[in-house]
């Protein structure tokens, strides 16, 4: 395939981006598009063109026009909740704090971000509106308030709370009402995430000794263990199509990102770094982003679900 493009300035100051994709074997025009935009959106238009090329060549869903949310530590007591393009560019701070911020995640519609802030010297879960910057605390109970995660339909939040003793998984409505306990174990249950079909909640638990990934039906019933190939597994996340589960596996003292095919049960280590954390799938479920440490500095990396492709995002600050 051959991609050809042109960028031109219009008389009204806007930009016009034109692109053509040709089949080099037949010479046929496979795809074309014209984008007209202001200067602020030129790079996003380039990402949309990259998505069209990628989808035409692979048949898979788009990836490049998506957004990242992460926490950067800019100084000893300075933290930022950052929104950026998928390549780390167009970086914007959604929140600044002198206390740690952890566990940011997207709402399914991309309009809200729940996260945990320690600004009041205790962990509190907030939900922030991206359009306005307005936010409200939805979990400020005694003890631990952590690990928020939206259901696929955006109607339910899962959180990890220690309000009744050991940290357990609780569910609530997206507006913070209707809190109810979901797991009941003699261990620590944390890091919940929903399956794509909304039928299961995956989570980390040490109920059997060392931490492992479990899942429990949302409709009720006992939890079942999911991971068996590692003596230590944490931080589950499920792809939007429901095919893959990613998690952090400790192998010979190294914390590496693993991907499980939920249909076959096959596990694949997809990174070569040894301090990975917080994996998250791209919208098309074929790539994921994760945090790791290289030369004593926190960075973001990406990997394909088969481990064949990987890259590192630079210039993002200490993640």
Where are these regions (language model features)?
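Amphipathic beta-strand/beta-sheet edge segments enriched in Tyr/Trp
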Residues: 1-48, 52
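Extracytoplasmic
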Residues: 2, 12-17, 63-65, 76-78, ...
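Sec/Tat-exported extracytoplasmic proteins
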Residues: 11, 25, 57-61, 117, ...
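A residue-level detector for well-ordered beta-strand positions
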Residues: 20, 82-84, 104, 128, ...
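Aromatic (tryptophan-biased) beta-strands that constitute blades/sheets of beta-rich domains
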Residues: 27-35, 92-95, 137, 183, ...
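Conserved beta-propeller blade repeats
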Residues: 41-45, 56, 98-116, 135-136, ...
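Short beta-strand elements that form the blades of beta-propeller/WD-repeat-like
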Residues: 66-71
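Beta-propeller blade-edge and WD-like acidic-aromatic loop motif
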Residues: 77-92, 112, 116-137, 155-156, ...
